[in-house]
Amino acid sequence: MPKENSRVATIGGLALAVTGLAHFVAPQLFEGLTESAFPTDTRRHVYIDGGIETAVGLGLAAPQTRKFAVAAMIGYLLYMAGNVVRNR
């Protein structure tokens, strides 16, 4: 079973990394989502979010960095949620 969990984490991490890269390829797709957290200079934040998601995704994909990546992902989600609440 742990091997299956590792495979799921690897695939999920790679999927997150691909989504992060998509922020650079088609940033307009993410502007609507990002605008609620960052209403000013939204495009810049789309790129920053893409970089963070790519890094966290790659971290999740590698077993050696998975624990750190989970902590980073939790911090990132709290940061985003805080910005959404603050900019309501």
List each language-model region with its residue ranges.
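Short amphipathic, positively biased membrane-proximal segments
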Residues: 1-88
